[in-house]
């Protein structure tokens, strides 16, 4: 998915490196690393090289690196792509808790059902143009977010000519 990590480090080393690179105190970093490994369910893989992680584990370790400094805003690109359902639910809980504590999460996603379930506000952007923005309820306007997205963006494919599929 194009995500670049120092994958010859272990997960623990990568999160630690990220925190120290950002000038954080070593003791604070060490405590947060252990917390992040625990909540991301990566303790068993903490000392394995990131290169050996699955795609879902890559997502979780990247999120841990993004969270180590407790930023006010997290910008995430497809955070649930290639993540198993249990990890997805855990990440959702982590992000919801982060928001409840005052953080802001900006998500870029093509999974409209997840966006509709998780987000309070949404913006639909197509070809660099803002098509709609507001609360999820206002943008959906009585439709599912996926249907509204297709309605706003257009481009639903023609289905004629596939009668041979119904043999």
Predicted regions and their residues:
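ABC ATPase "signature
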Residues: 133-134
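Conserved ABC ATPase "signature" region
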Residues: 16, 20, 27-45
């Amino acid at each position: 998915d194009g995500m670049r990590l120092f994958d010859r480090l272990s997960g623990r080393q990568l999160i630690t490196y990220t925190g120290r690179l950002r000038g954080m105190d070593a003791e604070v970093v060490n405590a947060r690393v252990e917390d992040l490994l625990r909540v991301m369910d990566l303790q068993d893989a903490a000392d394995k090289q990131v290169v050996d992680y699955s795609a879902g584990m890559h997502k979780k370790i990247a999120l841990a690196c993004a969270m180590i400094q407790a930023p006010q805003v997290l910008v995430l690109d497809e955070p649930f792509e290639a993540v198993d359902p249990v990890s997805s639910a855990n990440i959702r809980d982590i992000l919801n808790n982060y928001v409840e504590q005052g953080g802001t999460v900006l998500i870029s996603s093509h999974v409209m059902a997840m966006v509709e379930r998780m987000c309070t506000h949404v913006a639909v952007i197509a070809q660099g143009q803002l098509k709609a923005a507001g609360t999820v309820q206002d943008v959906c306007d009585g439709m599912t977010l996926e249907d509204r997205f297709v309605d706003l963006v257009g481009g639903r494919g023609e289905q004629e000519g596939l009668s041979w599929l119904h043999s």
